[in-house]
Swiss-Prot record:
GO terms for cellular component: chloroplast thylakoid membrane. The chain crosses the membrane at residues 125-145, 184-204, 270-290. Belongs to the Ccs1/CcsB family. Residues 1-38 form a transit peptide. It comes from Oryza sativa subsp. japonica (Rice). PANTHER family: CYTOCHROME C BIOGENESIS PROTEIN CCS1, CHLOROPLASTIC (PTHR31566:SF0). It is found in: Plastid, Chloroplast thylakoid membrane. Residues 1-36, 76-99 are annotated as: Disordered. This is Cytochrome c biogenesis protein CCS1, chloroplastic. It holds the Pfam family ResB. The gene is CCS1. One of its GO terms (biological process) is cytochrome complex assembly. Keywords: Chloroplast, Cytochrome c-type biogenesis, Membrane, Plastid, Thylakoid, Transit peptide, Transmembrane, Transmembrane helix. It is a multi-pass membrane protein.
């Protein structure tokens, strides 16, 4: 049987000369030779010549599709040379493109390596623990160092000529911003670094674990099942009965032929991711509070008012003024409650809020630990003061005498004022001195500084001093209010709630069970990520409930024995 050959189909009209002619004109088309190569046969002769080659004239385009190879018997025209030059340029362009792609791939490879190395560094557990300890240390330091004071306070308390502990001066406090610890670049930078570590750990460790845990992995080998942490064999048992019992224990059960896979507690695998997200929420809320909040304080006498925006100061670059800052606050009344010993027990402020149109939008009486909240602004009752005394002298008045705070050692307050009895324009003014520690009682002294008596503002009883009848009409107190906007508080609260929930969920055990029906025997294996002793006990209780199968012959024997 002859071997098939490759057929070279030559155009008989083409010239076979191979001499190089002169350069033709562009318009002249050179003669050419068309060769059809058929790949459905192989050559019988050796070498590359024409010996042993069967030639057949077949018109181009008929029969099987064949590859055309065109040879020019003469040099191509100038225009075609230009096309050839374009081919060379095209080849050069392809070469440049390959070089560019090679450089791009090298750059991408470098980025991938750097990213992988960075993720590996950030997800390092000792690094994350060190970051948390550093943040805790800074928080503790922030409770020791008085926050938000004027620079002169730190100059005085941490002088350079007498450093605290021999080295701590005001420079150690003010330079890194520890006078505002929770908005300092050091503290916020550590928070950002810890957040990056948590995200890297989640991406490189927790998410792959969850992906693996979600797969339904059947085991088709009894040897693989016996390698699990818990392994047991049940002779004369059915895998279907085992699946029903597992579902009764809260397992999700899947079967495929003789194989069974069951699991429960998958939420415990998701919980670490939730813990990380909750911690990131807490840190994001704390950062927003430090850089996007407003804070202010004001002392307002009873009966006066103020605009919220006039007393608020931004704390960071993310602090944006809300519309609620145009709200006006009016102090309707300020009063205090006292213990039997006379000490102040609680103080109250009756406040009304008015919008730009003068309409009252809210009214509330606030006290310590019971603030007013409106439009994202919280108004706290934090302090009190003595604003003025209303006094009548010899039936004239009442006169409003401003009470000035007097500095004392200790926490007790003392306020004082003077009712002049002579011309106030003289250089040596004398008068009646009045002192008070609270709004209940006023102590009076004459021009010589001698004690005269005590009067309660509510009694309105007159007292004779240096020939003048004095009546204390009223004591006007002032309320000390702290105002704050903190957009990060809802985020922090949500983060703490999620942290508590996900921490509890993380204690759920993720248990997995595999089983294989091997003839009449069921091979069972299982593992869990925590509570391994409890899992072993649960498996023993579970397998004790799997019914044993009895064959028909055994039933007959049992029936005969019972009959006899």
């Amino acid at each position: 049987m002859p071997s098939p050959t490759c057929y070279l189909l030559l155009n008989p009209t083409a010239s076979r000369s191979h001499h190089r002619p002169r350069l033709p004109l562009p318009a002249a088309a050179p003669p050419r030779r068309r060769v059809h190569v058929s790949c459905d046969a192989r050559r019988t002769g050796g070498g590359g010549g024409g010996g042993g080659v069967k030639r057949e004239a077949i018109p181009a385009g008929t029969g099987k599709a064949k590859k055309q190879v065109v040879f020019f018997d003469a040099a191509p025209p100038v225009s075609q040379r230009g096309g050839g030059g374009g081919g060379e340029g095209e080849g050069e362009g392809e070469g440049e493109g390959k070089v560019a792609r090679r450089k791009e791939n090298a750059a991408l490879g470098l980025v991938r390596r750097l990213t992988k190395r960075t993720l590996s560094l950030l997800s390092n557990l000792p690094l994350a623990i060190s970051e948390m300890f550093a943040i805790a240390a800074l928080m503790a330091l922030g409770t020791v160092i008085d926050q938000g004071e004027a620079p002169s306070y730190y100059f005085e308390k941490f002088p350079e000529d007498n450093p605290v502990f021999g080295f701590i001066t005001w420079r150690w406090i003010l330079t890194p911003g520890f006078d505002h610890m929770f908005s300092s670049p050091v503290f916020l930078g550590l928070l950002a670094l810890l957040a990056a570590s948590l995200m890297a750990c989640t991406y490189t460790t927790q998410i792959p674990i969850v992906k693996v845990a979600r797969r339904w992995s059947f085991m088709h080998s009894a040897g693989s099942i016996r390698k699990q942490e818990f392994a047991e064999s049940l002779p004369r048992a059915s895998i279907q009965d085992l699946g029903v019992i597992l579902m009764g224990y809260g397992y999700e059960v899947f079967t495929k032929g003789p194989s069974l896979y069951a699991f429960k507690g998958l939420a415990g695998r998701f919980a670490p991711i939730g813990v990380h997200i909750a911690m990131i929420f807490i840190m994001a809320g704390a950062t927003l509070s430090a850089t996007g909040s407003f804070k202010g304080s004001v002392d307002v006498p009873q009966g006066l008012n103020f605009v919220i925006g006039d007393v608020m100061k931004p704390k960071g670059v993310l602090s944006f003024v809300p519309d609620v800052f145009n709200t006006e606050v009016h102090v309707n009344r300020f009063y205090m409650e006292y213990y039997d010993s006379g000490e102040v027990s609680q103080f109250y402020s009756d406040l009304s809020l008015f919008d730009l149109d003068g309409k009252e939008v809210m009214r509330k009486t606030i006290k310590v630990n019971d603030p007013l909240r409106y439009g994202g602004v919280t108004i706290y009752q934090t302090d009190w003061g003595f604003s003025a005394l209303q006094v009548k002298k010899n039936g004239e008045g009442p006169f409003n005498l401003a009470m000035a705070p007097l500095k004392l050692n200790g926490d007790k307050k003392l306020f004082g004022t003077l009712l002049p009895l002579e011309n106030s324009g003289s250089s040596n003014v004398k008068g009646i001195s009045m002192l008070a520690r609270d709004l209940q009682s006023i102590v009076l002294y004459d021009q010589e500084g001698k004690f005269v008596g005590v009067r309660r503002p509510s009694s309105k009883l007159p007292i004779e001093i240096d020939g003048n009848e004095i009546v204390i009409e009223d004591a006007i107190g002032s309320t000390g209010l702290d105002l704050k906007t903190d957009p990060g508080i809802p985020i922090v609260y949500a983060g703490f709630g999620a942290l508590m929930l996900t921490t509890c969920i993380s204690y759920l055990s993720h248990s997995q069970i595999w089983a294989l029906q091997d003839g009449s025997t069921v091979v069972i294996g299982g593992k869990t990520n925590r509570a391994k002793l409890e899992f072993s006990e649960e498996m023993n209780r579970l397998l004790d409930k799997v019914p044993e199968l009895i064959s028909v012959n055994e039933k007959k024997i049992d029936s005969k024995q019972s009959a006899t």
